[in-house]
């Protein structure tokens, strides 16, 4: 699949919204049960921009959004600066074509360029494809939490994975 990875713009928000709401309604990748509107995604976009965090999109030659990825603060406390939690979502009809790998690789490069130290992934434990993608790019499982969420009438387990972006870096 030939896709371009680039910074998202406001014009990409309808495509991002469609992918997000599909994940809400049909997967356990997002633990929300209520779809959001464009104003919600605009507020999210504005917050990421204000914080200096990227939103990347994979797009086809026509500019159509095929997937997106982003990261933000892991926790809102000063001691966690340098650690971010990320998300990668690919449109349903584009999964399995390597877009997740492209997006996550680009996100890792961006995090390293920003001087970040650790990227964290919080993945529903039954999502073997996402766990495999993260393992492929060097993430390791750092914890598991059984039955901490619920969706579609069942309990969800959470797997945490992390990637140390610069293992040789000294503590500040």
UniProtKB/Swiss-Prot annotation:
Binding site for substrate: 75-77, 85-87
UniProt xrefs under CDD domains: NAT_SF
Binding-site residues for acetyl-CoA, renumbered to this chain: 88-90, 96-101, 127
GO molecular function, one term: acyltransferase activity, transferring groups other than amino-acyl groups
Disulfide bonds: none
UniProt-listed Pfam families: Acetyltransf_1 (PF00583)
Reactions performed catalytically: L-methionine sulfoximine + acetyl-CoA = N-acetyl-L-methionine sulfoximine + CoA + H(+); L-methionine sulfone + acetyl-CoA = N-acetyl-L-methionine sulfone + CoA + H(+)
Ranges that cross the membrane: none
EC number in record: 2.3.1.-
Reported function: Plays a role in the resistance against the toxic effects of L-methionine sulfoximine (MSX), a rare amino acid, which inhibits glutamine synthetase (GlnA). Catalyzes the acetylation of L-methionine sulfoximine (MSX).
Subunit structure: Homodimer.
Entry protein name: L-methionine sulfoximine/L-methionine sulfone acetyltransferase
Organism: Pseudomonas aeruginosa (strain ATCC 15692 / DSM 22644 / CIP 104116 / JCM 14847 / LMG 12228 / 1C / PRS 101 / PAO1)
Encoding gene per record: pitA
């Amino acid at each position: 699949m030939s896709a371009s990875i680039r910074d998202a713009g406001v014009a990409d928000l309808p495509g991002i919204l469609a992918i997000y709401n599909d994940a809400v309604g049909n997967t356990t990748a997002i633990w929300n049960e209520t779809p959001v509107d464009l104003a919600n995604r605009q507020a999210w976009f504005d917050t990421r921009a204000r914080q200096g965090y990227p939103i990347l999109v994979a797009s086809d030659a026509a500019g159509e959004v095929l997937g997106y990825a982003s990261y933000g603060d892991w926790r809102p406390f000063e001691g966690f600066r340098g650690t971010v939690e990320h998300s990668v979502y690919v449109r349903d009809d584009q999964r399995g074509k390597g877009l997740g790998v492209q997006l996550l690789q680009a996100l890792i490069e961006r995090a390293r360029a920003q001087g970040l130290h650790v990227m964290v992934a919080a993945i529903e434990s039954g999502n073997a494809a996402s766990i495999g993608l993260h393992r492929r790019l060097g993430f390791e499982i750092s914890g598991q939490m059984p039955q901490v969420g619920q969706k579609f009438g069942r309990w969800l387990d959470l797997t945490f994975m992390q990637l140390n972006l610069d293992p040789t870096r000294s503590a500040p």
